[in-house]
Regions:
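Divalent-metal (often Zn2+) His-rich catalytic cores of metallo-beta-lactamase-fold enzymes
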Residues: 175, 210-267
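Conserved beta-strand hairpin/beta-sheet module of binuclear metal-dependent hydrolase folds
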Residues: 2-58, 168-178, 184
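Metallo-beta-lactamase
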Residues: 44-46, 64-76, 102-157, 163-228, 232-233
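Residue-level marker for buried hydrophobic side chains located in beta-strands
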Residues: 38, 69, 93, 175-177, ...
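C-terminal regulatory/interaction regions
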Residues: 255-318
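Metal-dependent catalytic neighborhoods of phosphoester/phosphodiester hydrolases
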Residues: 78-88
């Protein structure tokens, strides 16, 4: 797959398509400060050449990158952290206190993913994560901040999608790097009369609907004007309406999970319920995308969301 150039989506913020599964599915970001630069998210191991190409494109030396920030440790966000850190000799890895240990020793993270996908598929999808030396890792608790040189970044604990999740606020652009806490919005769904379409993410294994509702409210309380999505890209304006749609999406997902009969067919029943809700939501939002194409675009998310809801039901004893 050819490497697309990094593109500036806001002053000093560059989007890099990580190439995960298909173009336009997963992004990471490069922030250029006055004194240094930082990556937000790494994507999977196979994305690292794209990040290094972006540095070369923008004339940024690897030694000038001071931080690599991962919002949480799912492999499509942080799987490449160790490989990227090897190429950035002066960088510090910033991770959630609950996730940092899995980047220092990714054995359990890798084993858990292999359990879901199988080893061959996991290697093809993500590549095997490389450990990061503990002395190069900093934990970012709620309220943590760092400065790239006239570019302060603030960190907020953001559970709900995962307990090891934070979001990063960029005051310079009044934007938030949301990881998966502000859902996903693919550009294939643009073009309708009601603006971007948002869909919630309930990836296994730590989905917590009450916590995710609270996280959405906390993000909105910061009054951001734009959100930098991993899945996918920059969305500006009307974030309160998008958050309201995500709140409804959380409740819809919970209803779909609870409506599924227990037993061997539960997963497919949950997935069928999510498909029906997705297509109804797209139609209600006025998205001009044929149903078959919509199911292709959201194929991976429907599967992962159904898996995550199954784990949530099991944890609740349902």
């Amino acid at each position: 797959m050819p490497i697309e150039p990094a593109r500036e989506v806001a002053p000093g913020i560059f989007l890099i398509d990580t190439g995960y599964l298909r173009p336009g599915l997963a992004a990471c970001y490069l922030i250029r400060g006055r004194d240094s630069a930082a990556f937000v998210e790494t994507g999977h191991v196979h994305a690292v050449p794209r990040q290094l190409a972006a540095l070369q494109q923008l004339g940024i030396a690897p030694e000038a990158v001071s931080h690599v920030i991962v919002t949480h440790v799912h492999l499509d966000h942080a799987g490449g952290a160790g490989a990227l850190m090897r190429a950035l000799p002066r960088a510090t890895l910033v991770a959630h206190p609950r996730g940092a240990r899995h980047l220092i020793d990714p054995t359990k993270l890798w084993a858990g993913t292999v359990l879901v996908y199988g080893e061959a598929a996991t290697r093809a999808l993500y590549g095997e994560p490389i450990p990061v030396p503990a002395e190069r890792v900093v934990e970012a608790p709620d309220g943590y901040s760092l400065d790239l040189g006239a570019r302060p970044l603030r960190f907020l604990d953001a559970p709900g999608h995962a307990r090891h999740h934070f979001v990063v606020l960029d005051d310079a652009t009044r934007g938030v790097f949301s990881g998966d806490s502000f859902g996903l919005s693919y550009r294939e769904t643009d073009g309708g009369p009601n603006g971007p379409f948002f869909f919630i993410s309930t990836t296994p294994v730590q989905f917590d609907p009450a916590a995710l509702h609270a996280t959405l409210d906390r993000i909105l309380a910061e009054r951001p004007e734009r959100v930098y999505l991993v899945h996918f890209g920059l969305v500006e304006g009307n974030l309160a309406a998008h958050a309201a749609a995500l709140h409804r999406g959380i409740d819809d997902h919970v209803r779909a999970a609870r409506a599924a009969p227990s037993g061997p067919g539960r997963h497919e029943a949950i997935k069928a319920g999510l498909k029906a809700r997705l297509l109804a939501g797209l139609a209600e939002h006025g998205v001009p995308l044929p149903a078959a194409r919509a199911l292709e675009v959201f194929e991976n998310d429907l599967e992962l969301n159904a898996q995550g809801l199954g784990v949530w039901l099991d944890a609740a004893g349902r």
